[in-house]
Amino acid sequence: KALEDKGVKDGSIGIVNINNSTNTAIQREAGFREAFEGTDYELLETQFCEGDAAKAQTIAENYITEGVVGIYGTNEGASTGVGNAIKASGSDEIIGVGFDKSDTLKGLIEDGYLVCTMAQNPDQMGKLGVQACIKALNGEDLGGEVTDTGVSVLTKESLAEDGVEETEEAADADDAEEET
């Protein structure tokens, strides 16, 4: 959407991932790639930073040199590197998005170097985790169930409102928890 809002309908997009063995990062990348299927954007070969923001910045700077229209970082280190590379480039044409939540990422969003970051909901994760532990300690069968605790999208607007835009999944997880 951010690309379309800038009138960019095609171009190359870089991906900076942690590594090729961290399951959550692999899934994040797969979802990102899936979102671009059937579009005119070319997703470049993923580069790995091992979670190191400085290495991620170098990777992102190389993508920028190649002329990408956007870059995605799959974790805090990768996202920080992406934002710092966009900042260093001086360009306001490159769209940067990330994953995870930190004061550094919030600053990069507020300063306009990242459009947004997807943040897990640690309070919800902790709350539901403790509830599951209590059930298990009481001998209840958890059935191997996976609980989606949702994700929140942090944008310049939501940060200015000192709030968070919840996805439907996060709202559904809250509703399910209230019913319990």
Stretches with model-predicted labels:
Residues 12-17, 33-53:
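Short beta-strand elements in bilobed, periplasmic/extracellular small-molecule ligand-binding domains
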Residues 1-10, 56-57, 101-105, 120-138:
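Hydrophobic alpha-helical segments within soluble ligand-binding/sensing domains
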Residues 23-42, 81, 85, 125:
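Short, solvent-exposed amphipathic alpha-helices that sit
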